[in-house]
Amino acid sequence: MANIKSAIKRAKTSEK
């Protein structure tokens, strides 16, 4: 389930 974690991290970083 690291896929969803990676997606969340990417979305959080993209929000910058």
Curated annotation (Swiss-Prot):
It comes from the Bacteria. It comes from Geobacillus stearothermophilus (Bacillus stearothermophilus). Belongs to the bacterial ribosomal protein bS20 family. The keyword Repressor does not apply. One of its GO terms (molecular function) is rRNA binding. This is Small ribosomal subunit protein bS20. Binds directly to 16S ribosomal RNA. Keywords: Ribonucleoprotein, Ribosomal protein, RNA-binding, rRNA-binding.
